[in-house]
Amino acid sequence: MPTINQLIRKERKKVAKRKKTPALQACPQRRGVCTRVYTTTPKKPNSALRKVARVRLTNAIEVTAYIPGEGHNLQEHSVVMIRGGRVKDLPGVRYHIVRGTLDTAGVQDRRQGRSKYGAKRPK
């Protein structure tokens, strides 16, 4: 417990809150270029091959982003849009790629939850 004099000399320091998406730098989305597109395996109770991409953003930060939906057309040098949102069973993946924008195609034959996957309304 500090004395009054100690508090006058040096005030209490605020504990900085950790940001969940630091690479976005307070922007809702960011543009970037894929440097590597690959699959990775999730944490212990789950088993799959999750599609992820290493993306170099316009602010020169390189992040790992998840590619949602079934099937994708991304490859190296594809220009993508990134939003926040982590993938719980992939450590270090704190961003999602936005489907249906820039070089990323929407999910084919998607009927429900279409807006999240950039799919047009079926005829």
Curated annotation (Swiss-Prot):
KW RNA-binding (keyword) present: yes
Keywords for the protein's UniProt record, in alphabetical order: Methylation, Ribonucleoprotein, Ribosomal protein, RNA-binding, rRNA-binding, tRNA-binding
Chain positions found as 3-methylthioaspartic acid: 89
Gene3D superfamilies, per database record: Nucleic acid-binding proteins (2.40.50.140)
Segments for region (Disordered): 104-123
CDD domains tied to this protein: Ribosomal_S12
SUPFAM superfamilies documented for this protein: Nucleic acid-binding proteins
GO cellular component, one term: small ribosomal subunit
Signal peptide feature range: none
InterPro entries cross-referenced by the UniProt entry: NA-bd_OB-fold, Ribosomal_uS12, Ribosomal_uS12_bac
Ribosomal protein among keywords: yes
An individual GO BP term: translation
UniProt biased composition (Basic residues): 113-123
Taxonomic superkingdom: Bacteria
GO molecular function terms attached to this record: rRNA binding; structural constituent of ribosome; tRNA binding
NCBIfam families recorded: rpsL_bact
Quaternary structure annotation from Swiss-Prot or TrEMBL: Part of the 30S ribosomal subunit. Contacts proteins S8 and S17. May interact with IF1 in the 30S initiation complex.
Family of this protein: Belongs to the universal ribosomal protein uS12 family.
Purpose: With S4 and S5 plays an important role in translational accuracy. Interacts with and stabilizes bases of the 16S rRNA that are involved in tRNA selection in the A site and with the mRNA backbone. Located at the interface of the 30S and 50S subunits, it traverses the body of the 30S subunit contacting proteins on the other side and probably holding the rRNA structure together. The combined cluster of proteins S8, S12 and S17 appears to hold together the shoulder and platform of the 30S subunit.
Record-given protein name: Small ribosomal subunit protein uS12
Organism: Oleidesulfovibrio alaskensis (strain ATCC BAA-1058 / DSM 17464 / G20)
